[in-house]
Amino acid sequence: MNIYNEGKRALDLTFTHQLVRMGAAKDWNNIQVSLGIDFDYYHYHDLLSLDPLASALFENSSLFSYFAGLVFNNLNERSAPTKGMSWAVSYHLYTDNFFQYKDNNPISVFDARWQGCFSPSSKFTVTPSFYGRVLSGSGNYPFAIINMVGGTIPGRYMPQQIPFTGINRAELSQAALLIAGLNLRQRILKNQYISVMGSYGRNSGKFHQILDSSESADMAGVGIGYMYKSFLGPVEIQLNWSNQTKKVGWYAGFGFVF
């Protein structure tokens, strides 16, 4: 896996991740409730970094976490929905011995996302979105938990990865991360669409500092894209820019996301 910083490759990483989950889930119509406990083991094999990094970030680690979550989805289709919404909220409590993390307080992670689709006409759809993820605890957050931003697909390389227009590759972020997005999609021919999209976000070391310009940083990105909806999945291409990369980038994709 490669990690980038402001659009430049900063880290090459190889690791093994093992997960054991014990829990329960219940569905009611379009909503799912889940809770349980996870055991995660991360073993880092190779690490090549161009930037100085905290060694604690990539220590081999065993994590025991308690989790609870709600997921709702009534979007009318997968690749180009025109109505409905999806949202999810979850809470994780991470430890390394069931009670503490490195002889300190456990790490709390609150995660929320929302996406809605509104169609003023049969060919035009407005899709706003919101993502938020906040960590609190000891402050020595490992790579397995730390916030990550970039790409177009949530959780593409790591479960905590949040998409952002104009940041096409995964980048590490601070402990408090809020992102808002907007996609304007127009159907031009049968199964063919063009979109204009944008993202704005803020991140900081502490949640209460996220609106303080001296303690936080903002991110902004814009893009334009084309999509063809085939029976094998959507074919997509996108041109974009962000104030993180400070250059025009591109993304291409094919197929459904599972």
Q: Positions of the model-derived regions?
A:
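Membrane-embedded beta-strand positions of outer-membrane beta-barrel proteins
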Residues: 33-37, 68, 87-89, 128-132, ...
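C-terminal structured domain segments
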Residues: 220-229
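Outer-membrane beta-barrel translocator domains and adjoining extracellular loop/strand segments
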Residues: 1-7, 45-53, 81-83, 97-106, ...
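C-terminal outer-membrane beta-barrel translocator/porin domains of Gram-negative envelope proteins
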Residues: 67-69, 75-189
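Gram-negative/organellar outer-membrane beta-barrel architecture
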Residues: 1-71, 75, 149-161, 170-178, ...
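A generic structural micro-feature
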Residues: 14, 60, 81, 104, ...
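C-terminal hydrophobic structural anchor segments
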Residues: 185-220
